[in-house]
């Protein structure tokens, strides 16, 4: 039995295919979804989406949004997303270093919040590349 997974951003469809299982980062922690999962709607945190296709696991960096699960269909609408395989490791590492430097130079609460958000996004992209398969 499989699940139909659709990952959408405002600009494009990132994924639309059948999967065996996913592990999704939500605002209240990670949840695993298998076929016949109870219906749920949840906020999606900045984090990693793990996708199992048969014996292979893939990763995707998600930048926050919402997910709806029901009737073996999963729809994830996010601000932005990248497949782990599409992320350039050197560029992701440079972005992480820039985000860390921006946080250390942040002045005022607003700059600190924006720098922390940029740092979370950068860390998620690096994690999507470096995650170890199950």
From Swiss-Prot:
Pfam families assigned to the protein according to its UniProt record, in alphabetical order: ATP-synt_DE, ATP-synt_DE_N
Its membrane topology: Peripheral membrane protein
InterPro entries (UniProt xref): ATP_synth_F1_dsu/esu, ATP_synth_F1_dsu/esu_N, ATP_synth_F1_esu_C, ATPsynth_dsu/esu_N
Keyword Thylakoid: yes
Gene behind this protein: atpE
Predominant location: plastid
GO cellular component, one term: proton-transporting ATP synthase complex
SUPFAM superfamilies, per database record: Epsilon subunit of F1F0-ATP synthase N-terminal domain
Functional note: Produces ATP from ADP in the presence of a proton gradient across the membrane.
Organism whose genome encodes this protein: Drimys granadensis
Subunit field text: F-type ATPases have 2 components, CF(1) - the catalytic core - and CF(0) - the membrane proton channel. CF(1) has five subunits: alpha(3), beta(3), gamma(1), delta(1), epsilon(1). CF(0) has three main subunits: a, b and c.
Annotated protein name in UniProt: ATP synthase epsilon chain, chloroplastic
The keyword GTP-binding appears for this protein: no
GO molecular function, one term: ATP binding
Subcellular localization, as worded in the UniProt entry: Plastid, Chloroplast thylakoid membrane
Keywords: ATP synthesis, CF(1), Chloroplast, Hydrogen ion transport, Ion transport, Membrane, Plastid, Thylakoid, Transport
Family (UniProt): Belongs to the ATPase epsilon chain family.
């Amino acid at each position: 039995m499989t699940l139909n997974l659709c990952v959408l951003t405002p600009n494009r469809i990132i994924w639309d295919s059948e999967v065996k299982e996913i592990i999704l980062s939500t605002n209240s922690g990670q949840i695993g979804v298998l076929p016949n999962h109870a219906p749920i709607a949840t906020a999606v945190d900045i984090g990693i989406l793990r996708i199992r296709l048969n014996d292979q696991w893939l990763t995707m960096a998600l930048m926050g949004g919402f997910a709806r699960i029901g009737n073996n269909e999963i729809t994830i609408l996010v601000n932005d997303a990248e497949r782990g395989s599409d992320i350039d490791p050197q560029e992701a590492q440079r972005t992480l270093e820039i985000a860390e430097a921006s946080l250390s130079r942040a002045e005022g609460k607003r700059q600190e919040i924006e720098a922390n958000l940029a740092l979370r996004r950068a860390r998620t992209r690096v994690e999507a590349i470096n995650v170890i398969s199950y």
